[in-house]
């Protein structure tokens, strides 16, 4: 009897699986088209008192509120002798307390509320972010604006921050990947605020008065954009924030102007000796700004070349076919107001350093000379179209994105037109931008690794490395002093 029941169940399962019209393979499955319209920044733009700008969205999903202040100040705005002040400000704006509260007291109160307050300084923007339960909004805003408007940068917390960053500075040359990133940009950008590095002397010379002076110069309502999302009534939040910022004084500020006249480094191999059994490699040159009209076609081109994980050409050749690496590809980085960097990259054992580089260079030349395939183009475009909605997964993330658009001067129609510009990319356009922005003959090949086995090569690509171009052996600076070793 039991066997009969089991047989009947199995037969029913099989017959169900053979139902008419069922897809026989995944590619046969048809999904309804996804229709998604991105939110319009204008619907969330909120002017506050005293020229403070903002983007605000009510989100009643959870009893939480997130608020960020995006300040037009970053490490690039510092003089050469004040390098590191941005890092110290990151570590002391909150911890250094305010005129009326010690840093530990602020943190203890946030812990009691189950909230958080964080601050970060990047190249050209700084961000102070508050997260609290909606029932604690009033106290959270009081702490948030007290820190934003009245930081004290007390000596004790400042000295602790200096001790932490000096320990990190001592370790700056320990990791090959960190050395590669830093030294590669130095070669590409030259002597420029983008590549200036702090030393022990610059850290030691920074005082609480210096931090207060920078705060006074850059932190005022018209130089800040707020983003906020959470469980609140928009009109109520606006009224509360207006009370905090109404007495805050504005000022005239001329932001620093930066040169875009970068030097042209000599193409070739730039080698940094480190006792490691792998070579850490970047191959490339300066790229473009993300305000360039070619940005969209470059994104598609790079996805095909090396940015598309396992579907990309570099990964397929270097990893899947040759088995040389688990970390390889290509990238275009972007920075506000400057050309970013184009790089092919790979980590591979010392004996295959030259071979891996030659394979990546082959792919650089191939994408310039040959039109990409129909399937490659379709896959790349589909990736950007299908992942587009991910940019708006969280309400606070969306508001912050809108604040960033305004801060960097991008058109507020950026998201509205994004997919149409991606769809418009053609095979001919991909080849055009490949020839315009990928230049193997101008590439800097930066290698961090062990010279002897890397230079010797292996069976498929015997050395020496000067077959790839003129070799420049670089010495690292002592991170504490900035002095170049011999």
Regions found by a protein language model. Name each.
Residues 51, 69, 85-89, 110, ...:
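Buried hydrophobic packing residues in well-ordered domains
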Residues 95-101, 130-162, 308-309, 329, ...:
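M16/insulysin-pitrilysin zinc metalloprotease superfamily fold
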């Amino acid at each position: 009897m039991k066997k009969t029941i089991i047989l009947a169940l199995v037969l029913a399962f099989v017959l169900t699986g053979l139902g008419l019209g069922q897809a026989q393979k995944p590619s046969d499955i048809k999904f309804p088209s996804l229709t998604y319209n991105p939110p319009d920044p204008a619907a969330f733009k909120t002017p506050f008192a005293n020229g403070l700008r903002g983007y605000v969205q009510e989100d009643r999903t959870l009893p939480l509120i997130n608020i960020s202040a995006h300040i037009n100040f970053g490490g690039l705005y510092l003089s050469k002798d004040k390098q590191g002040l941005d890092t110290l400000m990151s570590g002391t704006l909150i911890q250094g307390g305010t005129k009326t509260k010690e840093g530990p007291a602020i943190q203890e109160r946030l812990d009691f509320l189950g909230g958080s307050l964080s601050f970060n300084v990047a190249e050209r923007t700084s961000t102070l972010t508050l997260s609290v339960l909606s029932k604690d909004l009033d106290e959270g805003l009081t702490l948030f604006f007290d820190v934003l408007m009245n930081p004290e940068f007390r000596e004790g917390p400042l000295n602790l921050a200096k001790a932490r960053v000096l320990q990190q500075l001592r370790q700056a040359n320990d990791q090959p990947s960190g050395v590669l990133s830093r030294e590669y940009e130095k070669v590409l950008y030259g002597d420029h605020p983008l590549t200036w590095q702090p030393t022990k002397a610059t850290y030691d010379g920074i005082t609480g008065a210096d931090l207060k002076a920078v705060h006074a110069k850059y932190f005022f309502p018209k130089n800040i954009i707020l983003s906020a999302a959470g469980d609140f009534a928009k009109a109520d939040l606006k009224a509360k924030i207006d009370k905090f910022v109404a007495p805050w004084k504005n000022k005239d500020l001329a932001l620093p102007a930066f040169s875009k006249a970068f030097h042209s480094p000599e193409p070739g191999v730039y080698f940094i000796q480190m006792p490691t059994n792998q070579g850490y490699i970047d191959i490339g040159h300066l790229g473009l700004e993300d305000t360039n009209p070619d940005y969209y076609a470059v994104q598609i081109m790079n996805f095909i070349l090396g940015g598309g994980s396992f579907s990309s050409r570099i990964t397929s050749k270097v990893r899947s076919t040759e088995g040389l690496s688990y970390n390889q590809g290509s990238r275009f980085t972007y920075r506000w107001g400057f050309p970013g960097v184009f790089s092919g990259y790979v980590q591979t054992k010392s004996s295959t350093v030259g071979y891996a580089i030659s394979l990546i260079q082959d792919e650089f030349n191939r994408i310039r000379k040959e039109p990409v395939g129909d399937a490659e183009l379709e896959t790349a475009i589909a990736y950007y179209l299908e992942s587009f909605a991910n940019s708006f997964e969280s309400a606070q993330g969306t508001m912050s994105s809108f604040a960033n658009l305004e801060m960097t001067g991008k058109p507020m129609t950026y998201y509205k037109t994004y997919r149409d510009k991606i769809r418009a990319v053609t095979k001919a356009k991909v080849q055009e931008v490949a020839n315009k922005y990928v230049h193997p003959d101008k590439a800097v090949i930066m290698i961090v690794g062990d010279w002897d086995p890397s230079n010797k090569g292996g069976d498929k690509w015997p050395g020496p490395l000067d077959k790839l171009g003129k070799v420049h052996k670089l010495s690292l600076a002592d991170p504490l002093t900035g002095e170049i070793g011999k």
